[in-house]
């Protein structure tokens, strides 16, 4: 059996390495799934993020035909503020808009994880509350100018410069970064029990 991470996120790669089982020869390969991330008009934020994680895992499985008995992990993270889904910004103005919305507010970060081998599929959803301090226009401009927000849900990275804006967090820090470690370990353990 071989573990495959269906992601191009360097943060997920780093986090998955942390989730390794010390008593096993745990390593993983990377594949880059390409899925349509457009929300469906009828789905909730929870349904949306769970669907994306599952579709990434399934697309990763399709890309893993060269791997013997692949176990493919897909994950997705969104930021939700008052029912509004904030994905990755499309440009700098979009990043500034998102950060202005998050300023002084508490939002929810949802990270879904799905693991499949084609026969068995397991998934988890992790919800974390994050409160931001008030951000000035200068704060937002400087942060967006750093380039950091451009590939991150909600236009911030808690593990880097964006962490300076976080007043408090209730829930999983690693889920906000992009991969909830406790839930991921649970999925890996479930899969190992079923194979």
UniProtKB/Swiss-Prot annotation:
Keywords on record: Cytoplasm, Hydrolase, Nucleotide metabolism
Major localization class: cytoplasm
Family of this protein: Belongs to the Maf family. YhdE subfamily.
GO cellular component, one term: cytoplasm
Annotated organism of origin: Shewanella frigidimarina (strain NCIMB 400)
UniProt-recorded Gene Ontology molecular function terms: dTTP diphosphatase activity; UTP diphosphatase activity
Stored CDD domains: Maf
EC class of the enzyme, as a word: hydrolase
Active-site residues annotated for this sequence: 76
Function: Nucleoside triphosphate pyrophosphatase that hydrolyzes dTTP and UTP. May have a dual role in cell division arrest and in preventing the incorporation of modified nucleotides into cellular nucleic acids.
Catalysed transformations (reactions): dTTP + H2O = dTMP + diphosphate + H(+); UTP + H2O = UMP + diphosphate + H(+)
Subcellular location: Cytoplasm
Gene Ontology annotations of biological process type: nucleotide metabolic process
Marked site (Important for substrate specificity) residue numbers: 11, 77, 159
Domain of life: Bacteria
EC annotation from Swiss-Prot or TrEMBL: 3.6.1.9
Needed co-factor(s): a divalent metal cation
UniProt protein name: dTTP/UTP pyrophosphatase
């Amino acid at each position: 059996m071989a573990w495959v991470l269906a992601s191009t996120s360097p943060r997920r790669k780093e986090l998955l390495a942390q989730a390794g089982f010390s008593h096993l020869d745990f390593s993983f390969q990377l594949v880059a799934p390409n899925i349509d991330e457009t929300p469906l008009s009828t789905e909730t934020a929870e349904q949306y993020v769970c669907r994306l994680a599952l579709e990434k895992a399934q697309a990763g499985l399709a890309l893993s035909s060269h791997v013997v008995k692949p176990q493919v992990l897909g994950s997705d993270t969104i930021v939700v503020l008052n029912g509004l889904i904030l994905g990755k910004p499309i440009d700098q103005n979009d990043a500034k808009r998102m950060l202005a919305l998050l300023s002084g507010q508490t939002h929810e970060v949802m990270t879904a994880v799905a693991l499949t081998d084609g026969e068995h599929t397991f998934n988890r959803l992790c919800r974390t509350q994050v409160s931001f301090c008030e951000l000035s226009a200068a704060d937002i401009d400087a942060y967006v100018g750093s380039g950091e927000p451009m590939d991150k849900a909600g236009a911030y990275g808690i593990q880097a410069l964006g962490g300076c804006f976080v007043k408090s967090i209730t829930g999983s820090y690693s889920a906000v970064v992009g991969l909830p470690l406790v839930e991921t370990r649970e999925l890996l353990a479930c899969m190992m029990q079923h194979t």
